[in-house]
Amino acid sequence: LRTIWPWDQDAVAASLEKTGRLLVAHEAVEVGGFGAEVVATMVDRLGPANIKAARRIGAPRIPIPFSPPLENEIRVTPAKIVAAAKAAIA
């Protein structure tokens, strides 16, 4: 998505209808974050039977460390996104 608001629900729905899979990654806290809204909206719109896998990747619900090495441990990384994508298609 290029924008968070308004977000292109039609584009996400078209992709989800084609693949049956949804992966939302963002740096905000995963619980109650934008990714949860995207997944919930798509489930409401397409129905759970049409979604094979829906995953969210976000920050854990903990304070963000000041130390860069510790911060890097909890950040959403390309490796974490790839791992979640592989799990979604397994």
Write out the residue ranges for each language-model feature.
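Thiamine diphosphate
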Residues: 1-90
